[in-house]
Amino acid sequence: MAMTSWPSTGRQRRHQLASMLLLVLVVVGIYVPVFALLPSLSYTPQSLPSAIPQDEKMISRKFYIKDDNFWKDGNRFQIIGGDLHYFRVLPEYWEDRLLRANALGLNTIQVYVPWNLHEPKPGKMVFEGIGDLVSFLKLCEKLDFLVMLRAGPYICGEWDLGGFPAWLLAVKPRLQLRTSDPVYLKLVERWWDVLLPKVFPLLYSNGGPVIMVQIENEYGSYGNDKAYLRKLVSMARGHLGDDIIVYTTDGGTKETLDKGTVPVADVYSAVDFSTGDDPWPIFKLQKKFNAPGRSPPLSSEFYTGWLTHWGEKITKTDAEFTAASLEKILSRNGSAVLYMVHGGTNFGFYNGANTGSEESDYKPDLTSYDYDAPIKESGDIDNPKFQALQRVIKKYNASPHPISPSNKQRKAYGSIKMQMTTSLFDLVRMTDPADVITSANPISMESVGQMFGFLLYESSYIAKKSGNTLRIPKVHDRAQVFVSCLSQDVDVGVLRYIGTTERWNNQPISLPTIECTTNTSLFILVENMGRVNYGPYIFDDKGILSSVYLDGQILHGWKMIPIPFHNLNQEPNLTFEMQHTKNRSKKFELTNDVGRKEPALFAGEFSINSEEEIKDTYLSFNGWGKGVAFVNEFNIGRYWPSVGPQCNLYVPAPLLKRGKNTLVVFELESPHLELSLEAVDHQDFTCGSNVSKVNQL
């Protein structure tokens, strides 16, 4: 580029210099105000004095630990928080539930991030709809909540596989979850490379609500791999920087804290414990696992209630007892997070499960995650626990509290007539042959690429006149056995339901005498009822996990036929099935007493005349057997009223619409004798032989 020479005279030089200065002022006057408004352009604060006040404001935003206290922008801060899970509440209700938490007096929301919701298949990321974490965090910010983000990768949370994607179970060689297994950590890193950059702009120091990020969850109750924990800290810091508080949560015992804490000064160790425990000796123990001056007392899971499994009495905790226990913490400047402030619903197939001392002692969670929390499953706050906790919290949170919102209106839409549209074996005929897996022996659900729902196993055998004995040593979780006379060229026969064997009650099944011109076909329908989310048995593959024995001999030659339906974060796929089979004649004739045991789809419709009539409702499954239900193709969860205690499934109003609403039920056993369902205006936990009881945890 050629250089321009200046004129020789001083007057000319001064004239041109003045002209150029004027030009520069004009350009600066136009250019800077316009382009300073464009956020996509980078700039330094020194070059743009008008931006300095905003930067100073950002620098002043700081949440930190000092002198055994939490500090927010230079002021001591007491965390009075609550767990509320975006994935258990429809997005249309996020703000409503947060407003109710605000009215309770909370200043902080703690929330898990379930990996399996966001990466249901390897590399397929979902951050829309009920998985829109960023929108949820921004909504918390809008409503002046701080956020404690529990990033996992393991979360527990009574959520399928503790939040791990089930496809991890199919990786070969077998992954060692929750350890420093390098292949497992590489997959965690790939996940966090997506998740944590979404969180970074929402950190408190960056103008967002996130003040703390938790790694793992109650690790001291599971393992002792410090290298694993240090690696998670390193990955989190790599994305989020050194200013964010990284924390762990463990039970309030020396053993669990010894194993679950990270022995570095920049990781904060929080504790959880039973509501009835004296908190202050536990907080004293907590200090031993934090650096000097870095141990503000925090119960990161103050239990407002407890979970309930199918077949148990619904858990209830006394309101005044719970409130008094909370006050023991808050009155001495301790911090606490209510677990849960609002439980919500295990929509889809995402409910978790527990085991006892044996893997076979399997206990799946209810669809409802009400948790006896102060904000009920449907958002109701007109209850003694909300009022008692609110009374205590108001003593310690001086910020203005909004008026408590009124309860959501509910409507009983009445009886819904149902009709059988599709049998299980109609669905089988519709299955693409390319989706059917063949193998000498049964293989797991995960190994055929199916993570949720049902898997049908098919084989054949030569029936004895004296009958046969079938044994499945290891089935996860529940298997219904059918036999029929079928052949490739004769697709007609009598389907017989023979019996059911369960993971927790595994018994041999006697196959009756059946006369077929060809081999007898054997069908075993296995239901995945939810993966274990806590304890040593979280490696919870589903399906038939052993050889199948017929009269003591291994039965070979199997087909695996997927029947997945759709889950919470998948596209609905019922429409084709319903339309394709609605008017088909059934090719199976059902025997009188057992015919009602054939799994089948039932459908019904109900109408809503106006937008004003769209309200929350509940579907009562009294008189039905066991299955899963879909409202307008949304999977609202499992029902099992014969076992209880949950009788009804919650249907939030945003799932409904003006005009015709469609209900589809996949019934595994026995439909209601009148083939009808009732839409009622209340929850009911009195089914089975179970009644409520009060537990003081």
Swiss-Prot record:
An example Gene Ontology CC term for this record: apoplast
Catalytic function, reaction form: Hydrolysis of terminal non-reducing beta-D-galactose residues in beta-D-galactosides
Tissue specificity of this protein: Ubiquitous, with higher expression levels in roots and siliques.
GO biological process, one term: carbohydrate metabolic process
Subcellular compartments: Secreted, Extracellular space, Apoplast
EC number(s) from the headed UniProt entry: 3.2.1.23
Glycosylation sites: N333, N519, N573, N583, N690
Class in the EC hierarchy, top level: hydrolase
Residues spanning the signal sequence: 1-35
Keyword Glycoprotein in annotation: yes
Keywords, sorted A to Z: Apoplast, Glycoprotein, Glycosidase, Hydrolase, Secreted, Signal
Pfam families in the cross-refs: BetaGal_ABD_1, BetaGal_gal-bd, Glyco_hydro_35
Single GO term (MF): beta-galactosidase activity
Family: Belongs to the glycosyl hydrolase 35 family.
Protein name: Beta-galactosidase 17
